[in-house]
């Protein structure tokens, strides 16, 4: 499972049965950044539904490779997810995934408003694909 943690959304992607291809699944929304209870609950449901053994969480590094506040929050999210679900967690560099996701969605010919809700799930699929390609 790939997860793109954001301040008000978490994009979710899963692999096919063979673990070869990542597919964007959904974007989980919340009103405030620290209101994560329902987000963790939904991810746990998806973990059970898809038989997930490993979650790849995007790590938003700065362009120089350093970690800022967003990376710290992503790590905290990942640690709490592991505690709540028992699933193994791997952090994956997610630099430039937003630009790549926007480019992919633009190639579909859809208007920006139509793709806004999908971008986080597409970013999660890119994060998961990058992990699969490196491992």
Predicted ranges, named:
Residues 2-4:
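Short glycine-aspartate micro-motif
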Residues 8-135:
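Phosphate- and other anionic-substrate recognition elements at nucleic-acid/protein interfaces
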């Amino acid at each position: 499972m790939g997860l793109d943690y954001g301040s008000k959304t978490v994009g979710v992607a899963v692999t096919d049965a063979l673990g070869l291809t990542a597919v964007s699944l959904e974007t989980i929304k919340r009103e405030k950044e620290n209101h994560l209870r329902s987000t963790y609950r939904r991810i746990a449901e998806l973990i059970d539904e898809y038989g997930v053994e490993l979650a790849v969480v995007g790590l938003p590094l700065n362009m120089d490779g350093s970690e800022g506040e967003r990376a710290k929050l992503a790590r905290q999210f990942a640690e709490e997810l592991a505690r709540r679900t028992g699933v193994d967690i791997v952090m994956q560099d997610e630099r430039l995934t937003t630009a790549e996701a926007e480019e992919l969605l633009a190639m579909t010919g859809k208007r920006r408003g139509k793709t806004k809700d999908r971008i986080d799930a597409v970013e999660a699929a890119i994060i998961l694909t990058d992990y699969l390609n490196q491992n």
